[in-house]
């Protein structure tokens, strides 16, 4: 296994099975963040993650963290909160604000550089990247974004500025995703937060099998049309 240097003149990726074991999943470096390359990466179970000032690094970890939306863990306190939720949740209303929120609302720093923001905004304009927004009194207080692959959604990042805002985004999205035929959410790498929400690890090969099947399936044509998913009770 060796780290592969990508060419700027080809969007081809090596097989994810050739990724390094340490650091886990590192597959390649270089290339660019063009829409064609990003889409090729997601279709092959690969995603970019790198620190500011470093070359673009491409990953496909083993195991892979996934969330089956129907197994989303909702705590009792979150259920009580959601019943009286003050939030309104929308889909694809403010992609730019959401990715900026994810980039800026991180005390420990962020990999979401200006180039990354612009790259995913281009994907959004092409209909491949999507956002879920959480509002309170017309102020954006949380949200999440990711990339669609048929009935699989590749979650990228989320942020929260008020109590339970990002959890609300995920809860409401999962409910609508299930209702419209969505099957799986890619969480990339398991952490304590995603684990608490019900995410689990599966072998990379199994994830790639799911991806190969689910990206061929389609959600209803209207699914990603900007709309309100949840409104607070009067």
From Swiss-Prot:
Belongs to the L/F-transferase family. GO terms for molecular function: leucyl-tRNA--protein transferase activity. Functions in the N-end rule pathway of protein degradation where it conjugates Leu, Phe and, less efficiently, Met from aminoacyl-tRNAs to the N-termini of proteins containing an N-terminal arginine or lysine. It comes from Citrobacter koseri (strain ATCC BAA-895 / CDC 4225-83 / SGSC4696). It is an enzyme of class 2 (transferase). Keywords: Acyltransferase, Cytoplasm, Transferase. GO terms for biological process: protein catabolic process. This is Leucyl/phenylalanyl-tRNA--protein transferase. It is found in: Cytoplasm. Transmembrane segments: none annotated. It catalyses: N-terminal L-lysyl-[protein] + L-leucyl-tRNA(Leu) = N-terminal L-leucyl-L-lysyl-[protein] + tRNA(Leu) + H(+); N-terminal L-arginyl-[protein] + L-leucyl-tRNA(Leu) = N-terminal L-leucyl-L-arginyl-[protein] + tRNA(Leu) + H(+); L-phenylalanyl-tRNA(Phe) + an N-terminal L-alpha-aminoacyl-[protein] = an N-terminal L-phenylalanyl-L-alpha-aminoacyl-[protein] + tRNA(Phe). GO terms for cellular component: cytoplasm. Its EC number is 2.3.2.6.
């Amino acid at each position: 296994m060796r780290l592969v240097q990508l060419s700027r003149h080809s969007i081809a990726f090596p097989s994810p099975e050739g990724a390094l074991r340490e650091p886990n999943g590192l597959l390649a470096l270089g290339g660019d963040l063009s829409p064609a390359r990003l889409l090729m990466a997601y279709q092959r179970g690969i995603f970019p993650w790198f620190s500011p000032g470093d070359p673009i690094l491409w990953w496909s970890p083993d195991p892979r963290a996934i969330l089956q939306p129907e197994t989303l863990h909702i705590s009792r306190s979150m259920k009580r909160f959601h019943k009286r939720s003050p939030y309104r949740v929308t889909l694809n209303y403010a992609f730019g604000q959401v990715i900026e929120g994810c980039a800026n609302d991180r005390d420990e720093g962020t990999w979401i550089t200006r180039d990354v923001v612009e790259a995913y905004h281009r994907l959004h304009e092409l209909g491949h990247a999507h956002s879920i927004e959480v509002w309170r009194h017309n102020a954006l207080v949380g949200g999440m974004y990711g990339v669609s692959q048929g009935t699989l959604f590749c979650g990228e990042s989320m942020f929260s500025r008020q109590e339970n805002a990002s959890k609300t985004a995920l809860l409401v999205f999962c409910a609508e995703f299930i209702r419209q035929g969505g099957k799986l959410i890619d969480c990339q790498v398991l952490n304590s937060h995603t684990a608490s929400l019900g995410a689990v690890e599966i072998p990379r090969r199994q994830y790639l099998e799911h991806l190969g099947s689910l990206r061929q399936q389609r959600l209803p044509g209207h699914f990603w049309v900007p709309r309100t998913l949840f409104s607070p009770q009067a």
